Amino acid sequence: SRYRFGCNIASGAGGIGKLETNCRALFDTGEGAVTGPDALGVSNTASQMVAMEVGACGPNANFVSACASGTHALGEAYRTIAYGEADVMLAGGTEACITPLTISGFTSMRAMCTTGNDSPKTASRPFDANRCGFVMGEGAGVLLLETEESAKARGAKIYCELAGYAANCDAFHITAPHPEGEGMSACLLGALSNAGLPKESVGYINAHGTSTPLNDKFETLAYKVAFEDHAPKIKISSTKGAIGHLLGAAGGVEAIVCCKVLAEQQVPPTINYETPDPDCDLD
């Protein structure tokens, strides 16, 4: 039933490019220059458009939770299926926000790398001692989540199982992570508890690894807090060294990477990691 088929497509900034274009047209020409149903560039448009394209009339939602948006959408899609509200969900994230406003905004927050112009390909260097901020990327990553019964009934190739999910927040600072890794470690433990899995079952983590000084340091700490003695045994890498930070799309793309890691039994490297940082001393 198409009413059992839903969409959770997230975006951190939505149609920010469209919004900037329309603002410019409004100020330069007047209100008649602003046209189109997506004139405001609202984030829920992505989920609406996908649902209309594939005829998905089930639960439909957009999640705007900054860099966690894509993962948030996947997790809530998992819950939607687990709660019996849908059998199939398209879920993930999309982002296209390399625009003057977003670049200026993140630069003003000192989050973006501004010293890598001589070698832009190596500017994004997660966990490296010489990292200086993230490099913005664009893209999309969407997965089809469904019950095991649904997948087998249609003869689908099953890549992996989404076993558990948890969500929380630091309630500490608008951009900086908690200096003791409290929120991140609690979320990791919550996901393991929800999945009914021991810490020792984790062999690989596709890290958030943004290439910012604070995130990479405290993310490493969070892994130590959550996994304790098992933390050094886990292989950890960040995709952002290769493709940059896709913001709201990051979780969707990186979930696909995890699916491929399980399917191929190969772990991707952290591109541009050259100089070890004593604060980021896991594998």
Which stretches of residues belong to each language-model region?
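Acyl-CoA/ACP chain-elongation machinery
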Residues: 85-132, 165-179, 207-216, 233-283
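Conserved small-residue
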Residues: 7, 50, 70, 77, ...
